[in-house]
């Protein structure tokens, strides 16, 4: 045999074996691929999600390269592992706010679903059913996922849930309402949760039962059979209504996904510090006032003998306020105000219009629902909403309910008090003191002290000074010094008392009137108390003997004048005093002229307590005189009037030898009584007090009081 032939046979045999191995390899890959398709189709009938999620990770290597790529793609795009999703839901339900919002959304959806049946028997879930501690969520899987949506399925199981249900039965004769206690036993039930991302708002979460669960209900009335009315609702009917509401409802809630700004350099694992804006975590109690309730276009078929009332109900905390009955008609208005306490979870306000007949029966005509509790809403607004007719009732096509909503923040207050948005005036009384001082050429100092006391009114009453200390503001003007040329008279001091100006004014009186009537720097008449005090002081070098003689003569003349006045008022004829120490007619008439008019302000009793006593007045150096004049509003006010009795009292003081510090210009002490009458008109140390007191016009022109 040729040896070359044997080598060629071995080469061909190796090639054949290699070809057969290749065919077997390709055939094996085809079998694996077919097996994978068959398994996927078989498991697709039971749901692709659980099949993909339930297989172990080792199966990815058994199905070949293509199947592994497909399975990896499905794992990344679709199903998540059960422990991860379950941990996410468990973390969300660990937060109290999320759990409360979830329960509240469920109860709200149950009430809405119960109102859609249109039956004469209406049920309402009054309280949020608390999920028992032994409730569990298991077998969480992701069955569908896209860019903005995700569908999860889980198994919910709980032992017992207890909650009250209010049942309202409406009939043409009457309306009855009873409360029932419901005990719900929930067997393991499959729940489908839909997650949808809404741009700009957050994550919308909705859930519903995939199949009708076998619910076990126990309904018991709150009242005993003897306490209940004659017409009772069958318990089986209530059970069916509750079951239909639970199974058919699909609650939904919104979760905020907005990012919060954190300080720079914050480590994710560390606990973020408390931000300043997060300090007022506890909401303040608010109140909601309902005013000007008005129902319009109710229809003309309402009888005049019936009455309508409005009921306001708040969802959380549950509150109910009733208005007084009003006569029925096409348009009804309730004038009283209703106050409701808002809580952090208050969301809806329901207004119901009830009709009551003469026999005492009530029935629901219509109702309207308003959203409340939003911080972005204005504090006060007018709301108009349509009325939904009650079961078996027909209202007008344009039946509406109008109400004015008024929010008040902070602690509850009475109606009519100002809200927090209204700026309230300060309760601290203020007192402003203005000093105006003028120095005459002859050395006489004319000082005007104007005191303006403000006592702000709160609720129409004055605050107590003992509880609100006064705030004193002292303003002193620049002292004015009049020279010999600029003064009203360029004569000497001794002759300035005798020679007046052409209009009859004394230079000191003219300065005093100018200071009292000068409007510059005076505050507007916005306070209940305003008082001006005039102080005229000066120094004249007069011998002591002349000063004492003038004081004695003036004191004796004033006493004689007072005795004669008393005798004249008792009925006996008497002549007027021959030489009273009164003002000369010239200055008096000038002071009574319109030039010296000063508008009087209303005074309070507190002004009386602030007046200086006689001892304070007499403590001044020299001769003093105190007088009060009446003030009639919008009439002329004269600071000094003829006939005013001035009693000069002299306190013993040390004087310089040969000189006197009297306020009277007694340079002509030995002159005639008429000269002394003029000279005694103004003293250099005279304190005149003006207290404006409004008296009735019937009193006429009373004599001033000393």
Curated annotation (Swiss-Prot):
Organism: Homo sapiens
GO molecular function: insulin binding; phosphatidylinositol binding; phosphatidylinositol transfer activity
Residue spans crossing the bilayer: 10-30
Biased composition (Basic and acidic residues): 602-614
Domain SMP-LBD as annotated: residue spans: 76-260
Biased composition (Low complexity): 417-430, 477-494
Cytoplasmic side, ranges: 31-706
Encoding gene (name): C2CD2L
Protein name in UniProt: Phospholipid transfer protein C2CD2L
Primary role: Lipid-binding protein that transports phosphatidylinositol, the precursor of phosphatidylinositol 4,5-bisphosphate (PI(4,5)P2), from its site of synthesis in the endoplasmic reticulum to the cell membrane. It thereby maintains the pool of cell membrane phosphoinositides, which are degraded during phospholipase C (PLC) signaling. Plays a key role in the coordination of Ca(2+) and phosphoinositide signaling: localizes to sites of contact between the endoplasmic reticulum and the cell membrane, where it tethers the two bilayers.
Membrane topology: Single-pass membrane protein; Peripheral membrane protein
